[in-house]
Every structure is written in C-alpha cells, then in structure tokens.
Amino acid sequence: MPFDNAYEAITEENDHTHWAFGTGFDDPLAGIDTAVPPGMDRDDLAADCLMFGDDALIMSHRLAEWCTNAPELEDEVALANIALDLLGQARLLLSRSAQVSGSGTEDTLAYLRDEHEFRNVRLAELPRRNFAHEIVRLLVFSTWRLAILTRLVDSPDPVLAAIAAKDVKELTYHRNYAAG
C-alpha cells in the first residue's frame, strides 16, 4: 500500500487514485494548530471535550439500537446515519480530550472506563422505549447540542472550534429530521 495508514488513503488529496466518485471526506482538523492556546486551562478543555464526546458516543449507541426496529426503512437509514455522525463527533472530541489530558487515546476513553466515569447527559443514555419517544429525545438532544456547539465555533481552542463548526452542520440536519 502506498500509504502509511488507512486514514491517509481516504483524504481528499488521494481521491483520484482510489475512489470512482470521491469520498466526500474532508479532514476538519487539517492544518489546525493542535497546541492548547496560552491561558486556556488544559483540564477544563479536556473535561469539556470528554463530556461532549461522551454525550455523542452514548447517544450514537442508543440511536443504533433502532436499526431493524424503526417503523419505516427510511427512518432506520436516517437514524443510522445520525448515529454515525454522532460517533464521528465522539471520536474527534474524545481524541482531543485524550491529547490534551495525556490520558491515552480515544479508544481508552471510549472503551476502557467504568460506567461511573462517563460524563454524558442522562438524556443520552435513557433506554429505548418507542419511536415517538426517540424522535422527541433526538429533537431535544440535537437542539440543545446545536446551541452549545454553535457557541463553541468561537472557542479559543482552534481544534474545538473546528470540530464544532463541522458538528453544527450535522446537528442542524439531526434537529430538522427530528422536527419533521
């Protein structure tokens, strides 16, 4: 393989060699200085990224439970795509938290913590009940998260700001889907 890793193989600059129709994949962190800005508290930044990452991770798992269980195929596909968006958000946020805190990797944070160490909002972890309840939960969750991440687009941390800018686009779709 002419690339050092799979991630390198799927970036835009390598589209012409691998994909018939392009990947549509843009790295939201390409060219961004990952150093924590002077005057910013590393512990607070790591904790915030961890909390937002946990919210997205847990909600993505809950939404994935609807695969083969939603009332219509279109809803299954929509919820699966939203779950994948949230999983992508979780990966970036957990990676940033791990990088800033020096506490391992995104996988360490996602898989090697005890249940009580997760810092997600309770809304994200509620068990699946019925489809109507899930759509209301998604509407509340995505509206709340969209409001927070819209403000974080102006974060002094350039990495968090870039992640938020990407996530705002996705969350707008999530909210609009849930609003019907």
For each predicted feature, which ranges?
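Acidic/His metal-coordination segments adjacent to aromatic residues that form catalytic metal sites
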Residues: 30-50, 112-138, 155
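Basic, Lys/Arg-rich alpha-helical nucleic-acid-recognition elements, primarily the DNA-binding modules
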Residues: 5-6, 36-50, 58-71, 75-77
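Internal, conserved structured core segments that host functional sites
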Residues: 123-177
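Amphipathic alpha-helix face/heptad-repeat signature
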Residues: 52-55, 82, 138, 167
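Amphipathic, well-ordered alpha-helical segments in soluble domains
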Residues: 55-63, 89, 93, 141-148, ...
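Conserved alpha-helical segments that form or flank metal/cofactor-binding pockets of metalloenzymes
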Residues: 3-13, 83-113, 178-179
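Helix-loop segments that flank and shape redox-cofactor active sites
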Residues: 59-81, 144-160
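Extreme N-terminal leader/anchor segments
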Residues: 1-41
